[in-house]
């Protein structure tokens, strides 16, 4: 809707894209799920009273469901999720993330490494830059390790990668069969500002044709 464009920018995603837009390869499945007890941003109901449940945001690569609570669902005329959250009694509920997860696939890490002739394994996010339409991006990592002929070799410090959202995700080739849990206690949004917990879960993933740079 553009309600926050002066605070956090807009999005290249528009309402008419849901249900058919190819966001990534058929291996890409993204869920919004506030229900797992082990994750960082878990609840039973949002602050407008909607019951939390696991919902596919992207299924088999297709953009399916927007992140919007009851008010946004009424405005958009589309189904959404239970994500209207307030940080305290003196703030209104606004659309927020909870646990946004990349669902596991069928590949073992060893299989993914063996499929790579020359590449790099990156871990631990260090820096980020995203344009104001949430389309072009650049991320830096603390640590990387070269992959050569299917084998992990030398360690690389501070590698970076960049791309365009749909192009990047359409080049997803394999998804790992186990997830690692992540989370933050201080995700900020809104005016006046509201800080809440958010969570992520992700397996290892293999991408082709990624623009990698930097590192030492």
Please provide the spans of the model-predicted regions.
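N-terminal small-residue-enriched
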Residues: 1-216
